[in-house]
Amino acid sequence: MILTNTEDVAGHKIIKNLGLVKGNTIRAKHIGKDILAGLRSIVGGEIEEYTQMLDEARNEAIRRMEAEAKEKGANAIICVRFSTSAVMQNASEVMAYGTAVIVE
């Protein structure tokens, strides 16, 4: 599966647009790690626990988006974007979305 954030795929011709595809996941940190992250935020610097959590969430959202595109018969996804939002205290949703296409 080819993924790109552009409107075309270099070296390929889009022959069919299959529409919007998306994948999302909601993640929360373990309370112990959340406390550690809170303490780290007081002194400043990167909060590695949340960096790792969001990286894992983005990867899962991409996998789910790719699965939806494959179900539609796509071999590429163009205009890939990410959206992140807080859905409740200490939990975040990550969504990946784009346009499923067939390229040759």
From Swiss-Prot:
UniProt xrefs under Pfam families: YbjQ_1 (PF01906)
InterPro entries per UniProt: UPF0145_dom_sf (IPR035439), UPF0145_YbjQ-like (IPR002765)
Disulfide bonds: none
Family statement drawn from the similarity comment of this UniProt entry: Belongs to the UPF0145 family.
Listed name of the protein: UPF0145 protein DET1617
Annotated source species: Dehalococcoides mccartyi (strain ATCC BAA-2266 / KCTC 15142 / 195) (Dehalococcoides ethenogenes (strain 195))
